[in-house]
A protein has these predicted regions:
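Short, amphipathic alpha-helical interaction segments positioned at domain boundaries
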Residues: 368-381
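Local cysteine-cluster metal-coordination motifs and their immediate loop/turn environment
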Residues: 10-21
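C-terminal scaffold of the Radical SAM
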Residues: 1-3, 23-49, 55, 61-337, ...
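Short amphipathic alpha-helical interaction segments
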Residues: 337-349
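Minor-groove-contacting beta-hairpin "wing" of winged helix-turn-helix DNA-binding domains
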Residues: 362-366
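Short active-site neighborhood of thiol/selenol oxidoreductases, capturing the structured segment around
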Residues: 5-8
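A short, conserved structural fragment
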Residues: 351-361
Length: 381
């Protein structure tokens, strides 16, 4: 079984109103350089860390690397090169790895992108979120719709032929027509991959407070469902395949790295708040950037959480996110559990509600089930 590597770069030019990730507003180059040094040290100390290595963690060859954030495209090419060199020295890498970097529009130049490409980055993922400038402003995004279009031109000019957009539906005050315009604008740019999410509200964010005080009204559940139906209809017409609840790709361009999470494959994660999975247990690093750096510099482990997983349960609710669903025979052979027998009453209820279906020894969500997936997942959590 192959593994992925995730590296968290927490710095952003500013914090978006809906963001619940571990991020820090970019202050100065010295802070970033110190963080990069800590990140490299954590990678170098990987095998000697307190998180006890299983055979999977020690032996799996790596076929994906993913820089997430935050805004990884704030890294200078020299910093990226140092991080990658530490990975190449430490891990066994397979050929033709997928190397993704998240980017924000208007944070990159043609020269920077060409440098990233020369260092092996072969997939770019960036958060367009919306093509409506007023919506971008309400979300606290620093870029404009024209910045997104310009960034795509820069990426293509630098030789990137695997580009992914993030878009968010169900934004405050957004109508179905607004969302359709956003989707049409994205499809005009012909990205190889689209991640299309319904807005999630996280407590403690400015947006959550604005919604609570009725300053930012949200679309109702029925409208959100219509927005999702529009996604599946329009992307299909343009040749995209829906391979996961929120992810659509042209043939051959599904995200290999993100698929590891849904298939319960190992991911070694480094950096502040990074979450790892070794095939048996999940690990999480310190969420505060300053504390993370201090721990690493003091030769301590940044790990603050470790938990053995109920893999039999996770395999179901994560696997159901995929359009192909779960192979029932493969599942029974792996875990010794007959899903139809163990969850008979719940499955009957969900099937009667039109949320799941059985087809050729597979259990999968229906189109309606993808809209109301949380109702299905709670059965297996």
């Amino acid at each position: 079984m192959s593994a992925g590597i995730y590296l968290h770069i927490p710095f952003c030019k500013s914090r978006c109103s809906y963001c619940d990730f571990a991020t820090d507003v970019f202050k100065n180059e010295e802070t970033v350089e110190r963080y990069v040094s800590a990140l490299i040290k954590e990678i170098e100390n990987f095998e000697s860390e307190a998180r006890a290595l299983s055979n999977v963690r020690a032996s799996a060859a790596v076929d994906t690397i993913y820089f997430g954030g935050g805004t990884p495209s704030l890294l200078a090419p020299q910093q990226l090169e140092k991080i990658l060199n530490s990975i190449y020295k430490k891990f066994s890498l397979m050929e033709n790895i997928e190397l993704t970097m998240e980017m924000n529009p208007a944070t990159v130049t043609s020269e920077t992108l060409k440098s990233y490409k020369s260092l092996g980055v072969n997939r770019a993922s960036f958060g367009a979120q919306t093509f409506d400038d007023s919506e971008l402003k309400r979300l606290g995004r620093r870029h404009s719709a024209s910045d997104v279009r310009e960034t795509i031109e820069l990426l293509r000019g630098a030789g990137f032929d695997n580009v992914s957009f993030d878009l968010i539906a169900g934004l405050p005050r957004q109508t179905l027509k607004d969302w359709e315009r956003n989707l049409d604008e994205a499809l005009k740019l012909n990205p190889e991959h689209l991640s299309l999410y319904l807005l999630e509200i996280h407590e403690g964010t400015p947006l959550a407070e604005q919604i609570r005080s009725h300053r930012q009204p949200l679309p109702d559940e029925d409208l959100a469902g219509e927005m999702y139906e529009l996604i599946t209809r329009k992307t299909c017409r343009k040749g995209y395949e829906q391979y996961e609840i929120s992810n659509f790709s042209l043939p051959g361009y599904a995200s290999k790295h993100n698929s590891k999470y849904w298939l319960c494959e190992p991911v070694y994660a480094f950096g502040v708040s990074a979450h790892s999975f070794d095939g048996n247990a999940r690990y999480a690093n310190e969420r505060d950037t300053a504390k993370y750096v201090s721990l690493i510099e003091s030769n301590d482990s940044a790990e603050v959480f470790r938990e053995e997983t109920n893999l039999a349960s996770e395999f179901i609710f994560l696997g159901l996110r995929l359009s192909k669903g779960i192979d029932l025979i493969e599942y029974e052979n792996r875990f010794g559990i007959n899903i139809k027998e163990k969850y008979a009453e719940d499955l009957q209820r969900l099937e009667e509600l039109g949320l799941i279906e059985f087809a050729e020894n597979r259990l999968k969500l229906t189109r309606k089930g993808m809209v109301y997936s949380n109702e299905v997942f709670t059965v297996f959590v």
